């Protein structure tokens, strides 16, 4: 959806054409985007599993991880404490139940890097790696370590919902969420950065009350529960 040439010049004719598309055709586009993302992730994860020395049984299912027909959430950014990438891990057992619910299937793709000398950020990545391994959730949730522009491009085009959980007011913008929106995805984000201004129920969900609370464990717990 974010090709270059199609967005040059006047956009009025694009709006006219888009408004004529049926809901079925738009959903078809969304399914195609998700399918391409899953294919890309399977190939990327297989290489990662081999290089990282993951168990052979994990490498063997690399071409089967994730489901192209399942609601897919994405979370990709620098892993630093103020972005709270571990907010979903507040209640690990509850998250396991959500991810493995066959009646309402959901899958999660995470990607990111920690700054070179940020031990706290590295610890956040390790928490996710341990969670996935401990509960053998490779078919439902993946962490992709080789975070680059190609991976980001595929994620913003293919995920159904983009997660963003910063501690307000530290989010400067949140441009990845904007890219997801123009690719037909939805946002589930803290009311911070661009989402504080752009949020409307038609295009996603808001997390938090829009106030500044600082480093507050009680608030983190409340927002984690709301996120579930």
Can you annotate each of these PLM segments?
Residues 1-228:
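Catalytic cores of carbohydrate-active enzymes across secretory and cytosolic contexts
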């Amino acid at each position: 959806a974010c090709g270059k040439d199609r967005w040059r010049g006047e956009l009025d004719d694009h709006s006219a054409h888009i408004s004529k598309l049926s809901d079925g055709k738009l959903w078809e586009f969304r399914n195609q985007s998700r399918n391409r993302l899953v294919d890309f992730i399977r190939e990327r994860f297989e290489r990662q599993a081999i290089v990282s020395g993951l168990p052979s049984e994990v490498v063997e299912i690399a071409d089967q991880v994730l489901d192209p027909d399942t609601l897919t959430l994405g979370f990709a950014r620098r892993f630093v404490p103020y972005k709270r990438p571990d907010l979903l891990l507040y209640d690990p057992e509850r998250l396991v139940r959500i991810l493995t619910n066959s009646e309402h299937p959901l899958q999660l793709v995470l990607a990111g890097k920690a700054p070179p000398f940020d031990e706290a950020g590295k610890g956040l990545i390790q928490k996710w790696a341990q969670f996935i391994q401990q509960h053998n959730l490779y078919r439902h949730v993946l962490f992709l370590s080789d975070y680059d522009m190609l991976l980001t491009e595929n994620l913003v085009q293919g995920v159904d919902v983009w997660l963003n959980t910063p501690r307000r007011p530290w989010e400067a913008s949140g441009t990845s969420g904007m890219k997801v929106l123009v690719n037909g995805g939805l946002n589930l984000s803290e009311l911070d950065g661009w989402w504080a201004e752009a949020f409307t129920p038609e295009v996603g969900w808001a997390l938090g009350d829009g106030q500044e609370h600082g480093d507050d464990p009680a608030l983190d717990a409340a927002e984690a529960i709301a996120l579930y």
